[in-house]
Regions:
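Short, functionally critical alpha-helical segments immediately adjacent to catalytic or ligand/cofactor-binding
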Residues: 1, 35-38, 124-133
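Short, charged low-complexity intrinsically disordered segments located at boundaries
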Residues: 46-51, 63-69, 108, 124-126, ...
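Flexible, low-complexity segments enriched for small/polar residues
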Residues: 83, 87, 91-118, 126-182
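Non-catalytic, conformational "gating/processing" segments within enzyme and secreted inhibitor domains
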Residues: 1-104
């Protein structure tokens, strides 16, 4: 694990939580990153287990996204989740994964409100998403799911294989997935 201790906080972790996993780019400041990093000091892992070392935690006063106090990592996460932009960002990621890339900003706000109003519970959100007109619209069909041939070829590429089986074998493989080529 990287260094993440009082006096040497790991700003990368704080930045990645906000940028990649919760809020997206531009919804926080460099000051917020530094303060969040301080709040996460003492957080680490050993193997696959979370470890908190209170002696390595910066328990001083912090200000993060307008919240002041002796904040720790849980406080930072709670503050991030309280931001409407977080729900909108996560709703957008889920929509783009399950439906299609093109997402109207007004719909993203509405989906974010739904996610947030349900305490970030995924089941009610997914039920709404999977039963939505957008999910079943012709322009959404097959935009996120690979067909059997595309799936087989991309699997070979990801495995680093240079040769794809000949027609009979490849047709048998894709046929088992529901799409015969020949």
């Amino acid at each position: 694990a990287g260094v993440n201790v009082k006096g040497a906080p790991n700003e990368n972790f704080a930045r990645e939580i906000m940028e990649l996993f919760s809020m997206g780019v531009g919804n926080y400041t460099e000051h917020d990153i530094r303060e969040a990093a301080r709040a996460f000091t003492g957080w680490n892992f050993e193997g696959l287990e979370f470890r908190f070392n209170a002696a390595q935690h910066d328990d001083g006063e912090k200000e993060f996204l307008g919240r002041r106090g002796r904040l720790d990592g849980v406080d930072v996460i709670d503050t991030i989740l309280a931001q409407p932009v977080t729900a909108e960002y996560l709703a957008g990621k889920l929509y783009r994964y399950f439906v299609r890339e093109d997402l109207d900003p007004a719909l993203q706000r509405k989906l974010g409100e739904l996610l947030r109003s349900n305490g970030y519970r995924i089941a009610p959100f997914m039920e709404t998403l999977l039963l939505s007109r957008d999910f079943h619209a012709p322009e959404s069909v097959a935009t996120r799911i690979k067909g059997p041939v595309e799936q087989a070829v991309s699997t070979y590429k990801k495995m680093g294989l240079r040769e794809i089986p000949g027609a009979p074998d490849f047709n048998e493989l894709t046929g088992a997935l529901g799409q015969k080529l020949l």
